[in-house]
Amino acid sequence: MLEKVGCGAIAIPCNTAHFWSSDIANALTINFISMVAVTRDFIHQHNGTDMDNLRTIVLGMEANIQRKLYGYSAAGWGGAVPDVDSIQQDATRVIDDVKSGNISRARFKMALLVARTRSLKPDAIILGCSELSSASRDIFKGTDVIDPVDVLVDACISWFRNS
């Protein structure tokens, strides 16, 4: 339907929806701007290497971690894997707070979560759930926290300007 009214591209700002991104893209006759693909490209451009060569921590729902949308976040962590797993469980609690409308508590927990995550010195921290994006608006300084929603917005603007 969007195609019939002149939409030139579709983007979905939800990591979980990208489980079906190939099905979605194959069903379209217009461009599908994949949040996962543009985020992986962004990280590659800013780190000079593929994500598989970086120590990353993906924060998100367990399903997103298991599906490895952004690669295997426990790679290269050795004995710190239990800490990474615990951090990801804390991310789920932030997501639950956002979904229940408790944004101020979610923002507080999110700040603590990112500080704890940074203590492990990852190359990148990826917000693998759009609820985490909404809980993190403007509270982070630095380039280590990657918000796929922000990357997707930039990619959509770039697509629009170039089409």
Where are these regions (language model features)?
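Non-catalytic structural scaffold of enzyme domains
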Residues: M1-S163
